[in-house]
Amino acid sequence: MTDYKDTLNLPQTDFPMRANLPEREPQTLARWQTLDLYRKIRKDREGQPKFILHDGPPYANGRAHLGTAFNKTLKDIVVKSKTLSGFDAPFVPGWDCHGLPIELNVEKKLGKDKLSANAFRQACRDYAFSQIELQRDDFQRLGVLGDWQHPYLTMDFGYEADTVRALAKIVANGHLLRGQKPVHWCAACGSALAEAEVEYRDKASPAVDVGFEAVDAEAVRQRFGVKNATTRVLVPIWTTTPWTLPANEAVSVHPELHYALVKSELQNQPVYLILAKDLVDSAMQRYGVDDYEVHGNLKGDALEGMQLQHPFLDRIVPIILGEHVTTEAGTGNVHTAPAHGLEDYFVAEKYNLPINNPVDARGRFIPDTFLVGGQPVFKANEPIIVLLADSGHLLHSETIQHSYPHCWRHKTPLIFRATPQWFIGMNKNGLRERALAEIEKVTWLPAWGEARIGKMVADRPDWCISRQRLWGIPIPLFIHKKSGELHPKSPALMEKVAQLIEKESVDAWFDLDPKVLLGDDADHYEKVTDVLDVWFDSGVTHFCVLEKRRELKVPADIYLEGSDQHRGWFQSSLLTSLAIRDKAPYKSVLTYGFVVDSQGRKMSKSLGNVILPADVVKNLGADVLRLWAASMDYTVEVNVSDEILKRASDAYRRIRNTARFLLSNLYDFDPKKDKVAVDQLVALDRWAIFTTQKLQEKIITAYDRYRFPAIYQAIHNFCTVEMGSFYLDIIKDRLYTSKESGLPRRSAQTALYYIAEAFVRWIAPIISFTADEIWQFMPGDREPSVFLTQWFSDFPNAALSGEEEQRWQLLLQIRDEVNKALETYRNEGKIGSALAAEVVLYADERLNAAIATLGEELRFVLITSEASVLPFNEKSKAAFDTALPGLALEINVSEFEKCARCWQRRSSVGQIKEHADLCDRCVSNAFEDGEMRQFA
């Protein structure tokens, strides 16, 4: 048999079938760096409309984990898609560099006491730099394009100085206040914590009912209408923090709740109890009392001012009114310790009660505290409970499990502790109302984010922005020693401090002699040594970065972070921006769910489910990780596992194989010379171009709406359905067997060229390394990188009428039914390949109209050696119905010889003496002018 291989146009390409991403991606990275790609993009997009995605700074501590890898990948997808849309979309990465975790690492390594404060801060700075280098390498290895040589760092002298300037504006605008307020306090940190640094965990706590005895029992009984009695009156409170009882200054009742006087016997003595009417039964059940009488009924406001004896201190405390009292649990009477609770503080403030804080910064009672002096607060619970039991004031005690605030770093329980702190006042100058109004103007993605952050802002307390740490940006203020007032020239003085910090670092403030700035006034003022909450540091990036860097702008078009940032960076950015310039720093905010394993569990070493991005990149490649990120529904928790990543790897392989097919059939195609005009295209090729163009519109819209899973699905379906199992399959015969430069082949190549030009751009934001690798093998003159282009727009006008479009949709369905039938025949051993079959289609009028025009070329669509169409009502006995209404099939095994070149079984094989093993079509294609195709 003659070998006709040289007469075929077999696919050729140097684009490798095996991706080998772990080795090939670093080569692409090196090329990008040699090319200075990021700078080239900036120059290319100069003068175009700006699109700013502002990078929320990750903490400079440890290698990138899967959550931060997911974060940076989504951001990179957005930035690259906007670049392809023609925007100037710079990406300036940043790092959050101050704060406790860095302090703890340095302390562990070097010891805090061995270093001066300045040396300790320098060690923290050095440590942060080392961590930034690690993370920068991780993010670049993921293919994230950005200004990695000029990131913003919250510890840069310039940034620290601008943070002071931001605070100065907030001071000048009247939003800063100082107060002895209770704040979340971590004894291990020795500092106040922000709301965003608090996490809730289950904790076992003692729950006790404690009786406060009425000083004038007779007057109380009379208020309830009980006369001629001598029994004592107790007001029971219920608390899970007995250790706060030494700081008790009042008992709160709700002014509108109804309270009952309950007569009973407790500890073998008659007693009257004042309880919220709705809680009488549950309280008495808790006290183990079945026999009791309810006497009288008063609203809470009638109890105001009643005096009670503290259960173990020589202190008389009043009953006061508080709207925070509920009947969800307890007694309706709330133990009020203004130093240890925000609601307690606010209600006590109305009554001008003292703020008695007996707990020091280490979480221990001060030495002269009765009974528990020097003890850690949680250990003080036991002796207090014993004392209450011995004195007859303990009505009930049990241990309960409940959700309790913990330090995000130490995982230890927090306390509320009143200390002198600096706050941004939520109700000062209408900040809360303006924040809520501004939230409504922002686009929140998903939409439920608006309600979430709105509720948080509506309910949040004043923001405590001061910390008692070494490593941080100072709050450079002077307070008058007698009046406690800020220096009247504070904003101007802060600018002078900012100028010093810009040159010398934050040490300039801590080393500063107040006389340098204040002169003789220095004796009257105290220098503040607190530092700023790190959420303030990162919260003013809109001022220190967006407003300061020439290539950026404020407001940013989008902030994109995890959903936990509704209470973190989104809030701190919003509040500081409003306090500075009275508008939000962002136009839209996109959030995503936490990255968890396939069972919805957080990544944990103890569970053994931790997947490191570095390992994924090393084993599968960054593009597989990026494809996984794009495929996930980020509006909920994001699942990852080895199996899920394997599926992403399989999907990647399909995309790569599609690209390889396109490239391998364009090896001899010069778009300048070989493109076929649209009016000369084979109909199937025109359909393919039209389908590609339509899909591109959907893909660009999905990119614009940040619907990445929809893009992934669209590309996956395009590779597997429209292209893989239909179009590319059909045109193989034409590509390989038609005349090399003939119209049928050049028509198919023209379509493949347009598809490749569009396709490589679609995938570029997601699998960036692979897209740029494909780009190097594309035909024609082009830019050195796909990222220096825009979405492909040079499509010919290949629009189809609605009728034509419908016809091709029906052909897809018909071919699907034929394929299923042929597969059955293959499985039964009746045929080896589809080309061994001859198919008769019995079609109703609707289907007949779709396929009749194809005539002889129908067999190319079905990839059979013969295909004919007959009316549906002429079905033979051998025909069988399909799942498509109006279509029946009859499949016969061809009796003809197989063509040695195209493998089709045709009656013309053996009829041409010079080429007895070829069909007439192959003789024409190989040795004559070549066949013509109109439809397929």
From Swiss-Prot:
Taxonomic placement: Bacteria, Pseudomonadati, Pseudomonadota, Gammaproteobacteria, Legionellales
Entry text on domains: IleRS has two distinct active sites: one for aminoacylation and one for editing. The misactivated valine is translocated from the active site to the editing site, which sterically excludes the correctly activated isoleucine. The single editing site contains two valyl binding pockets, one specific for each substrate (Val-AMP or Val-tRNA(Ile)).
Protein name: Isoleucine--tRNA ligase
Species: Coxiella burnetii (strain CbuK_Q154) (Coxiella burnetii (strain Q154))
Assembly mode: Monomer.
Note describing how the cofactor binds: Binds 1 zinc ion per subunit.
Residues binding Zn(2+), per UniProt: C899, C902, C919, C922
CC annotations in GO: cytosol
Pfam families (alphabetical): Anticodon_1, tRNA-synt_1, zf-FPG_IleRS
Binding site for ATP: K605
EC number: 6.1.1.5
Family in the record: Belongs to the class-I aminoacyl-tRNA synthetase family. IleS type 1 subfamily.
HAMAP family listed in its UniProt record: Ile_tRNA_synth_type1
Binding site for L-isoleucyl-5'-AMP: E561
Compartments where located: Cytoplasm
Location of the motif 'KMSKS' region: 602-606
Key words, A-Z: Aminoacyl-tRNA synthetase, ATP-binding, Cytoplasm, Ligase, Metal-binding, Nucleotide-binding, Protein biosynthesis, Zinc
Example GO biological process: isoleucyl-tRNA aminoacylation
